[in-house]
Amino acid sequence: MTKKILWIFVLAVAWTASPAAVKSPPKEMSEETKECVNCHKKDNPGIIQQWGSSKHYGANVGCYECHAADPGDPDAYLHDGKKVKKHISIIVSPKDCANCHEKAATEMTESHHAKGGRIIGSLDNLLAEVIEGNNSLKTPAFPDGVSPAAVSGCWQCHGSLVKVIGDGQLDPATWPNTGIGRINPDGSEGSCSACHSRHKFSSAQARNPENCGKCHLGPDHPQMEIYEESKHGIAFHANKDEMNLDSPKWIVGEDYTAAPTCATCHMSATKNQDITHDIGNRISWNNRPPVSIRPEVSDQKYGLKSASIKWEERRDNMKDVCQACHSENWVDNFYIQYDALINLYNEKYAKPGLKLMEVAKPLLKPSKFSNKIDWTWFELWHHEGRRARHAAAMMGPDYTHWHGTYDLAKHWYSKFVPELEELIEKGKAAGGDKASAAAKLQVALDDMLNSDDHKWYLDKLTDAQKKMRKAAVDRFKEQMDGKVGSSR
């Protein structure tokens, strides 16, 4: 929607006192906003109190400055019964925020965050819409129904496609929604209030790790839990009063040194970098898909401008953040460890797993998740594999190992391999094309199990490898018995 912000036409200059430069505010509160306040302070006092303690209030930016609409906007409606009848809209979209926060809004809408609503059609959404749910929620925009599991689950983080049902009113299946990739009636993607919650829009709140934890948690992307166990999370909670979270510029190494938060590493300013609202510009691996890929590859698929930024540049951007507190050698060595874990996951599990699932297709029922092995494979990469990768990125050892590579290996060898073997046996027994497909799968499975990464399963370690393992066990026993020092 294109908002008629009354004071926008008298702005003369943009000011840059803050890294997130905004345009000059109005000199006084508008009459329209005053009227909004007079009613809503009685009907919705929490809204007015929050706004009254915000920087928006101090800058004379009020209800009407954000919610004003043109009559032709898809979600505009005449707010009647008032002294001054004006068109407003319920949703304040990134396009509206861009009237003042142009740089931040542009960066955000060109980021992966803003594309989160494009989940429709993915395996995740198939689960919520069909397998977990049903079409029992019927609304004006969804007369045939939509899944409550998708509406109250996926869409609340990823964002809904907001539907207008007439006279500016929004379909209840799609609103309320503050999903980061919400698709708004004006065509914009994203929701600034996903991080800058209404109606205080606090930078300090957005800088807190819990702010990101609404969505970045759980079995498939437990960044919040990983942060809590990491040295960074421990330092944050121990020294929160030293974080200076309200600082306008909030430069790590200058305004604070106690700990980093999610925002520190992925968005906030350093002595050498400006704030960015494109959260992909410091990430050197995309660990969302079954096989980890470089971020410019996924950016290209989404048509993002950042596809031109190579992973090496993004890594240098992140290293600049790290080196506000850590030495260059420390940071370089961390990335050696991180890359090694990603390589382990990709080469030992992800690539062989994808190949085996492709070869197994002729032996599977066509409907996704109608086969036991569909669930096993999905959780291998989508849950355990992601946990290990994300934890390595954030230095969370328990989630890297016990919740990550341990669960990954346990289910690979105790579920995935036996389920492949079961498919092979059933295919052989069926004869014909199934038997031929089973023979091909047997070859692929044998190739995987006889590879250096997996041959232990067949008891095919070399004599040298067995000798090395025995020596390690013997040494451990000696250490436990106090016969040798652990540093010997």
What are these regions, as identified by a protein language model?
Residues 1-5:
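Positively charged n-region of N-terminal signal peptides that target proteins for export
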Residues 19-488:
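Short sequence/structural segments immediately N-terminal
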Residues 7-19:
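Hydrophobic h-region of N-terminal signal peptides that target proteins for export
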